[in-house]
Protein backbone atom coordinates (compact mmCIF):
# COMPACT_ATOMS: atom_id res chain seq x y z
CA UNK A 1 0.00 0.00 0.00
CA UNK A 2 1.26 3.47 -0.88
CA UNK A 3 0.87 4.84 2.66
CA UNK A 4 2.90 2.04 4.20
CA UNK A 5 6.59 1.67 5.06
CA UNK A 6 7.98 -1.83 4.61
CA UNK A 7 11.36 -3.47 4.14
CA UNK A 8 14.64 -3.15 6.02
CA UNK A 9 14.03 -0.61 8.80
CA UNK A 10 17.41 -0.82 10.56
CA UNK A 11 20.52 -2.78 9.64
CA UNK A 12 23.09 -3.97 7.14
CA UNK A 13 21.90 -5.51 3.87
CA UNK A 14 25.13 -7.54 3.63
CA UNK A 15 24.79 -9.08 7.11
CA UNK A 16 24.82 -12.90 7.24
CA UNK A 17 21.72 -14.14 9.07
CA UNK A 18 21.62 -17.44 10.97
CA UNK A 19 18.72 -16.83 13.36
CA UNK A 20 15.46 -14.86 12.95
CA UNK A 21 13.03 -13.74 15.64
CA UNK A 22 9.44 -13.26 14.44
CA UNK A 23 7.24 -10.72 16.22
CA UNK A 24 4.10 -8.72 15.60
CA UNK A 25 5.77 -5.51 16.87
CA UNK A 26 9.33 -4.44 17.62
CA UNK A 27 9.07 -3.77 21.34
CA UNK A 28 11.95 -3.31 23.78
CA UNK A 29 11.15 -6.77 25.16
CA UNK A 30 11.42 -8.25 21.65
CA UNK A 31 14.82 -6.58 21.11
CA UNK A 32 15.98 -7.98 24.46
CA UNK A 33 14.80 -11.45 23.47
CA UNK A 34 16.58 -11.22 20.11
CA UNK A 35 19.80 -10.24 21.88
CA UNK A 36 19.52 -13.10 24.39
CA UNK A 37 18.85 -15.73 21.72
CA UNK A 38 21.51 -14.42 19.35
CA UNK A 39 19.13 -13.49 16.54
CA UNK A 40 20.70 -11.22 13.92
CA UNK A 41 17.32 -10.33 12.42
CA UNK A 42 13.93 -9.38 13.86
CA UNK A 43 11.11 -9.86 11.37
CA UNK A 44 7.98 -7.94 12.34
CA UNK A 45 4.59 -7.41 10.79
CA UNK A 46 4.08 -3.84 12.02
CA UNK A 47 6.77 -1.36 10.93
CA UNK A 48 8.78 0.35 13.66
CA UNK A 49 9.39 3.33 11.37
CA UNK A 50 6.01 4.27 9.99
CA UNK A 51 6.93 7.94 9.67
CA UNK A 52 10.38 9.53 9.52
CA UNK A 53 11.53 10.45 13.05
CA UNK A 54 12.74 14.03 13.56
CA UNK A 55 15.37 12.85 16.06
CA UNK A 56 16.85 9.56 17.25
CA UNK A 57 17.73 9.93 20.93
CA UNK A 58 17.26 8.04 24.17
CA UNK A 59 14.64 10.63 25.14
CA UNK A 60 12.00 8.76 23.12
CA UNK A 61 10.85 5.15 23.05
CA UNK A 62 11.42 4.98 19.29
CA UNK A 63 14.90 6.43 19.64
CA UNK A 64 15.84 3.94 22.36
CA UNK A 65 14.70 1.04 20.21
CA UNK A 66 16.66 2.18 17.15
CA UNK A 67 19.81 2.81 19.20
CA UNK A 68 19.46 -0.59 20.92
CA UNK A 69 19.11 -2.37 17.57
CA UNK A 70 22.22 -0.68 16.19
CA UNK A 71 24.29 -1.20 19.37
CA UNK A 72 23.44 -4.90 19.41
CA UNK A 73 23.96 -5.33 15.65
CA UNK A 74 20.39 -6.54 15.18
CA UNK A 75 18.68 -5.98 11.83
CA UNK A 76 14.98 -5.14 11.67
CA UNK A 77 12.80 -5.99 8.68
CA UNK A 78 9.06 -5.28 8.52
CA UNK A 79 6.50 -6.75 6.14
CA UNK A 80 3.13 -5.09 6.73
CA UNK A 81 0.35 -4.56 4.17
CA UNK A 82 2.48 -6.31 1.54
CA UNK A 83 2.36 -9.43 3.72
CA UNK A 84 -1.37 -8.94 4.31
CA UNK A 85 -2.23 -8.72 0.64
CA UNK A 86 0.15 -11.08 -1.18
CA UNK A 87 -1.19 -14.45 -2.35
CA UNK A 88 -0.58 -16.90 0.48
CA UNK A 89 -0.07 -14.04 2.96
CA UNK A 90 -1.96 -13.14 6.12
CA UNK A 91 -5.39 -12.62 4.50
CA UNK A 92 -5.27 -15.95 2.66
CA UNK A 93 -3.83 -17.77 5.67
CA UNK A 94 -6.61 -16.49 7.95
CA UNK A 95 -9.15 -17.84 5.44
CA UNK A 96 -7.27 -21.16 5.42
CA UNK A 97 -7.11 -21.43 9.23
CA UNK A 98 -10.88 -20.90 9.46
CA UNK A 99 -11.37 -23.71 6.95
CA UNK A 100 -13.06 -21.65 4.23
CA UNK A 101 -12.59 -21.95 0.49
CA UNK A 102 -10.21 -19.54 -1.23
CA UNK A 103 -11.85 -16.12 -1.39
CA UNK A 104 -11.92 -13.35 -3.96
CA UNK A 105 -9.85 -10.22 -3.31
CA UNK A 106 -11.77 -7.25 -1.93
CA UNK A 107 -9.40 -4.44 -2.90
CA UNK A 108 -7.00 -5.57 -5.65
CA UNK A 109 -3.45 -4.28 -5.83
CA UNK A 110 -2.79 -2.03 -8.86
CA UNK A 111 0.52 -3.82 -9.46
CA UNK A 112 -0.46 -7.47 -8.88
CA UNK A 113 -3.88 -8.86 -9.79
CA UNK A 114 -3.38 -11.81 -7.42
CA UNK A 115 -2.76 -9.55 -4.40
CA UNK A 116 -4.86 -7.09 -2.44
CA UNK A 117 -6.41 -6.32 0.92
CA UNK A 118 -9.27 -8.46 2.24
CA UNK A 119 -10.97 -11.61 1.04
CA UNK A 120 -14.64 -12.48 0.47
CA UNK A 121 -15.61 -16.13 0.73
CA UNK A 122 -18.86 -17.89 -0.12
CA UNK A 123 -19.72 -20.61 2.35
CA UNK A 124 -20.31 -24.09 0.95
CA UNK A 125 -22.49 -24.71 3.99
CA UNK A 126 -24.54 -21.91 5.54
CA UNK A 127 -23.68 -21.03 9.15
CA UNK A 128 -25.24 -18.78 11.77
CA UNK A 129 -23.32 -15.87 13.26
CA UNK A 130 -23.04 -17.82 16.52
CA UNK A 131 -21.57 -20.84 14.74
CA UNK A 132 -18.99 -18.60 13.06
CA UNK A 133 -18.09 -17.05 16.43
CA UNK A 134 -17.53 -20.52 17.88
CA UNK A 135 -15.42 -21.47 14.85
CA UNK A 136 -13.22 -18.39 15.35
CA UNK A 137 -12.79 -19.08 19.06
CA UNK A 138 -11.70 -22.67 18.46
CA UNK A 139 -9.56 -22.02 15.36
CA UNK A 140 -7.69 -18.95 16.65
CA UNK A 141 -7.82 -19.74 20.38
CA UNK A 142 -9.80 -16.55 20.99
CA UNK A 143 -11.48 -16.34 24.38
CA UNK A 144 -13.55 -13.18 23.81
CA UNK A 145 -14.59 -11.04 20.88
CA UNK A 146 -17.00 -8.20 20.12
CA UNK A 147 -19.90 -8.59 17.72
CA UNK A 148 -22.75 -6.54 16.36
CA UNK A 149 -25.65 -8.21 14.64
CA UNK A 150 -28.03 -11.14 14.98
CA UNK A 151 -26.49 -14.31 16.43
CA UNK A 152 -29.13 -16.44 14.73
CA UNK A 153 -28.83 -14.91 11.26
CA UNK A 154 -27.80 -17.39 8.59
CA UNK A 155 -24.63 -16.29 6.78
CA UNK A 156 -23.81 -17.13 3.18
CA UNK A 157 -20.93 -14.78 2.36
CA UNK A 158 -18.15 -13.52 4.66
CA UNK A 159 -15.62 -10.70 4.26
CA UNK A 160 -12.29 -11.17 6.08
CA UNK A 161 -9.72 -8.44 6.74
CA UNK A 162 -6.96 -9.06 9.29
CA UNK A 163 -5.84 -6.10 11.42
CA UNK A 164 -7.77 -2.83 11.15
CA UNK A 165 -10.46 -3.50 8.57
CA UNK A 166 -13.28 -1.05 9.15
CA UNK A 167 -12.25 1.03 6.11
CA UNK A 168 -13.40 -1.95 4.04
CA UNK A 169 -16.91 -2.23 5.48
CA UNK A 170 -18.27 -0.48 2.39
CA UNK A 171 -16.45 -2.86 0.04
CA UNK A 172 -17.73 -5.83 2.03
CA UNK A 173 -21.31 -4.60 1.69
CA UNK A 174 -20.94 -3.91 -2.05
CA UNK A 175 -19.58 -7.41 -2.60
CA UNK A 176 -22.63 -8.90 -0.90
CA UNK A 177 -21.08 -10.01 2.38
CA UNK A 178 -23.51 -10.76 5.21
CA UNK A 179 -20.74 -10.59 7.81
CA UNK A 180 -17.21 -9.21 8.19
CA UNK A 181 -14.43 -10.58 10.40
CA UNK A 182 -11.73 -8.06 11.30
CA UNK A 183 -9.74 -6.44 14.12
CA UNK A 184 -10.00 -2.82 15.28
CA UNK A 185 -13.41 -1.21 14.87
CA UNK A 186 -15.01 1.93 16.27
CA UNK A 187 -18.50 2.59 17.57
CA UNK A 188 -19.95 4.77 14.80
CA UNK A 189 -18.67 2.60 11.93
CA UNK A 190 -20.12 -0.49 13.55
CA UNK A 191 -23.41 1.21 14.44
CA UNK A 192 -23.97 2.49 10.90
CA UNK A 193 -23.11 -0.73 9.10
CA UNK A 194 -25.11 -2.82 11.53
CA UNK A 195 -28.09 -0.64 10.57
CA UNK A 196 -27.30 -1.38 6.93
CA UNK A 197 -27.54 -5.11 7.61
CA UNK A 198 -23.89 -6.08 7.98
CA UNK A 199 -22.97 -8.37 10.88
CA UNK A 200 -19.58 -7.44 12.36
CA UNK A 201 -17.16 -9.61 14.33
CA UNK A 202 -14.29 -7.67 15.91
CA UNK A 203 -11.91 -10.38 17.09
CA UNK A 204 -9.18 -7.91 18.09
CA UNK A 205 -6.16 -6.68 16.14
CA UNK A 206 -3.73 -9.08 17.84
CA UNK A 207 -6.05 -12.08 17.56
CA UNK A 208 -6.61 -11.45 13.85
CA UNK A 209 -2.87 -11.44 13.10
CA UNK A 210 -0.65 -13.25 15.60
CA UNK A 211 -2.09 -16.81 15.19
CA UNK A 212 -1.98 -16.20 11.43
CA UNK A 213 1.60 -14.93 11.62
CA UNK A 214 2.66 -18.11 13.41
CA UNK A 215 1.15 -20.17 10.58
CA UNK A 216 2.84 -18.00 7.95
CA UNK A 217 6.16 -18.36 9.79
CA UNK A 218 5.99 -22.10 9.16
CA UNK A 219 5.89 -21.34 5.44
CA UNK A 220 8.87 -18.99 5.84
CA UNK A 221 10.83 -21.74 7.62
CA UNK A 222 10.11 -24.13 4.75
CA UNK A 223 11.30 -21.57 2.18
CA UNK A 224 14.50 -20.83 4.11
CA UNK A 225 15.21 -24.50 4.75
Regions found by a protein language model. Name each.
Residues 1-225:
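Active-site catalytic microenvironments in core metabolic enzymes, especially phosphate/sugar-handling
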Amino acid sequence: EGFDNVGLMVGDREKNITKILLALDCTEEVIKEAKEMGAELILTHHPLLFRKPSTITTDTLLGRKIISLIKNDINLYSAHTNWDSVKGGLNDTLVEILGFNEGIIMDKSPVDSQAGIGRVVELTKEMTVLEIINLIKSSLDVKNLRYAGDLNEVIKKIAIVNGSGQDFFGDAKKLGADLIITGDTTYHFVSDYKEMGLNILDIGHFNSEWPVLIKVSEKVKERLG
